[in-house]
Curated annotation (Swiss-Prot):
Organism: Lycosa singoriensis
Record's signal peptide: 1-20
GO cellular component: extracellular region
Function according to Swiss-Prot or TrEMBL: Has antibacterial activity.
Transmembrane spans: none
WAP domain span: 21-66
MF (Gene Ontology): toxin activity
Protein name: U15-lycotoxin-Ls1a
Disulfide bridge partners, by residue number: C24-C54, C32-C58, C41-C53, C42-C80, C47-C62
Biological process terms in GO annotation: defense response to bacterium
Taxonomic path: Eukaryota, Metazoa, Ecdysozoa, Arthropoda, Chelicerata
Tissues expressed in: Expressed by the venom gland.
Length: 86
């Protein structure tokens, strides 16, 4: 009986981890000088290891997703270039 309860609880915990929403992390930076803005990525395919291309005030950077909302995924597009923006 106890093993069945444990199995059910384990399965519920596992599913909540797998099915939870993922977001770009919220940036701790609120502003950036124009000469410091750069894009390390323009889309998720530019990132490696399961990280996402996330927008920050200082440009786009590869970040690992988190379960806390607040960040913003990079829009990409044809005008996006990976380099300094100025």
């Amino acid at each position: 009986m106890n093993s069945k309860i444990f199995a059910v609880l384990f399965l519920l915990a596992f599913l909540s981890c797998v099915l939870s929403d993922q977001y770009c992390p919220k940036s701790s930076i609120t502003a950036c000088k124009k000469m410091n803005i750069r894009n390390d990525c323009c889309k998720d395919d530019d990132c490696t290891g399961g990280s996402w291309c996330c927008a920050t005030p200082c440009g786009n950077f590869c970040k690992y997703p988190t379960d806390r909302p607040g960040g913003k995924r990079a829009a990409g597009g044809k005008s996006c270039k990976t380099s300094y923006v100025y």
